[in-house]
């Protein structure tokens, strides 16, 4: 990294000629002349000269460093390597790999019984038979219009770079669609259930206020004060408040 490190720039300035003409230096001289008792009237010009030198050196250094960084960042881009180099050529996006199948050969001909497989809509020229030498058929299919079928060791190709090959009576299939399944919705929070009685039937009600039910289940008394609200988990009906006796009924 030593070659990329910028060198210390060389400043070609005649500070003895440009320093008195600098407007900031002239303002500093005026401040010193207007205030003879200025504490730094001796050290201020020298300190300001050092400040100008350091500032100019820093600006040149930053400009050179930025130029070196631009040259380094504008180089050729590195080729993007595949994550798995040994996986071979990748299929085109949206195309699934062709299926491949392999199956065992049929029994030899001669005295072996002839087994005719059921014809489920397959042409007669594609139905394998066990006469003489064994012959089979394999098929491969993909979810992105990739399909291949062959007889014996045949192979089929598709619109995508992938192909399917089958031999014997094997069959293979692959789904090559790159469409990702939608994420599952988050689970709903579990509400604790407590038993309760609604319309004479025992039901399980969630904790908290329920829509359609009164907040207080007690009846109002004579003093215009509501009864105590029963807890949601209690199955006993609320007690009826006792009306106060009149003055005339004390002796009876």
From Swiss-Prot:
Chief localization: virion
UniProt superkingdom: Viruses
UniProt GO BP: viral process
Stretches with biased composition (Gly residues): 94-109
A cellular-component GO term for this protein: host cell nucleus
Comp. bias regions, Pro residues: 182-192
Ranges annotated as biased composition (Low complexity): 83-93
Disulfide bonds: none
Keyword list, A-Z: Capsid protein, Host nucleus, Virion
Compositional bias segments (type: Polar residues): 213-237
Location of the protein in the cell: Virion; Host nucleus
Region annotated Disordered, chain positions: 69-252
Stored InterPro entries: Herpes_capsid (IPR009299)
Family named by the database record: Belongs to the herpesviridae small capsomere-interacting protein family.
UniProt function note: Participates in the assembly of the infectious particles by decorating the outer surface of the capsid shell and thus forming a layer between the capsid and the tegument. Complexes composed of the major capsid protein and small capsomere-interacting protein/SCP assemble together in the host cytoplasm and are translocated to the nucleus, where they accumulate and participate in capsid assembly.
Subunit structure, interactors included: Interacts with the major capsid protein/MCP.
Protein name, UniProt field: Small capsomere-interacting protein
Species of provenance: Alcelaphine herpesvirus 1 (strain C500)
Encoding gene (name): SCP
């Amino acid at each position: 990294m030593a070659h990329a490190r910028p060198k210390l720039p060389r400043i070609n300035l005649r500070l003895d000629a440009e320093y008195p003409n600098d407007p900031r230096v002239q303002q500093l001289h005026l401040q010193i002349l207007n205030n003879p008792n200025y504490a730094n009237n001796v050290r201020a010009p020298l300190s300001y000269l050092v400040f100008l030198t350091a500032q100019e050196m820093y600006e040149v250094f930053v400009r050179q460093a930025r130029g070196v960084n631009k040259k380094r960042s504008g180089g050729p881009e590195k080729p993007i390597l595949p994550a798995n180099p040994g996986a071979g050529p990748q299929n085109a996006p949206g195309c699934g790999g062709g299926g491949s199948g392999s199956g065992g050969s049929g029994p030899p001909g001669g005295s072996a019984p002839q087994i005719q497989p059921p014809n489920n809509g397959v042409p007669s020229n594609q139905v394998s038979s066990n006469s003489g030498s064994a012959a089979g058929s394999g098929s491969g299919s993909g979810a992105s219009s990739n399909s291949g079928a062959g007889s014996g060791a045949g192979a089929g190709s598709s619109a995508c770079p992938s192909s399917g090959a089958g031999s014997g009576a094997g069959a293979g299939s692959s789904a090559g669609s790159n469409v990702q399944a939608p994420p599952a919705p988050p689970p709903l929070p579990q509400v604790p259930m407590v038993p309760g009685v609604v319309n004479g039937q025992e039901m399980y009600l969630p904790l908290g206020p329920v829509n359609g039910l009164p907040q207080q289940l007690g009846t109002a008394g004579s003093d215009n004060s509501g009864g105590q609200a029963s807890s949601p988990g209690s199955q006993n009906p609320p007690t009826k408040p006792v009306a106060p006796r009149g003055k005339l009924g004390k002796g009876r």
